[in-house]
Regions:
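Flexible, low-complexity junctional segments that flank or bridge functional domains
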Residues: 2-4, 153
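Gly/Ser/Thr-rich loop/hinge elements
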Residues: 4-61, 88-94, 109
C-alpha cells in the first residue's frame, strides 16, 4: 500500500519470485505488433507459503501489476482498499530544453485479461484504513493487524 509504482520490469521480477508459472502481465500498444506478454519462469521461492498483499488507493502502476498477478493466480489474498487504477505504461521523452514529456505508450492487462485502468484491483477482503498517515507496526494499523491475525488463523 502507498506504493505509487515503478518499472514494469521490476513488477515482473518481483511477481516471478512468488509464482511457479503463467502469465504475469501483458502490455498492448496502439498496434497489435506492440503487444508483449510476460511470464513467470523461476518458480515460487517461498514454496506456497501464505501471502497477504495490503493495498489502498495509493497503490498504483507496478504495485497493481504485482497485486493483480498474485490475485489472478490465487497466490495471495489482497486485503485493504481498491488500488488507484493507473493501468498504463509510460515513457519519458527527453526534450531539447532539458525537460521531459511523459507519454503513455501502452496499457497493461492482468493475467485474466482485465484492464485495471480507472478501476484498480479490488481486494479480496475489504478493510478500510483507519489511521492518518502510514505507520508500519503501529498498534493502530487496522489493516496490518487484520493481515497478521488472518495469517495466524
Amino acid at each position: 500500500r502507498n506504493n505509487p509504482g515503478g518499472l514494469l520490469s521490476q513488477a515482473v521480477k518481483i511477481s516471478d519470485f512468488f509464482l511457479n508459472d503463467g502469465e504475469i502481465v501483458s502490455t498492448k500498444g496502439r498496434k497489435i505488433s506492440e503487444t508483449r506478454r510476460f511470464f513467470a519462469r523461476k518458480g515460487d521461492a517461498i514454496n506456497g507459503k501464505p501471502i497477504i498483499v495490503i493495498t489502498n488507493s495509493g497503490s498504483a502502476s507496478a504495485s497493481e501489476i504485482f497485486a493483480g498477478a498474485l490475485k489472478d493466480h490465487k497466490r495471495a489474498i489482497i486485503l485493504g482498499e481498491n488500488t488507484y487504477g493507473k493501468g498504463s505504461v509510460q515513457s519519458i521523452i527527453p526534450l531539447k530544453n532539458g525537460g521531459g514529456m511523459r507519454l503513455t505508450i501502452s496499457k497493461y492487462y492482468l493475467p485474466s485479461g482485465k484492464s485495471i485502468s480507472e478501476v484498480g484491483v479490488t481486494p479480496d477482503i475489504l478493510v478500510e484504513e483507519k489511521v492518518d498517515g502510514f505507520k508500519i507496526n503501529s498498534e493502530t494499523d487496522n489493516q496490518l493487524n487484520y493481515a497478521i491475525n488472518l495469517l495466524k488463523s
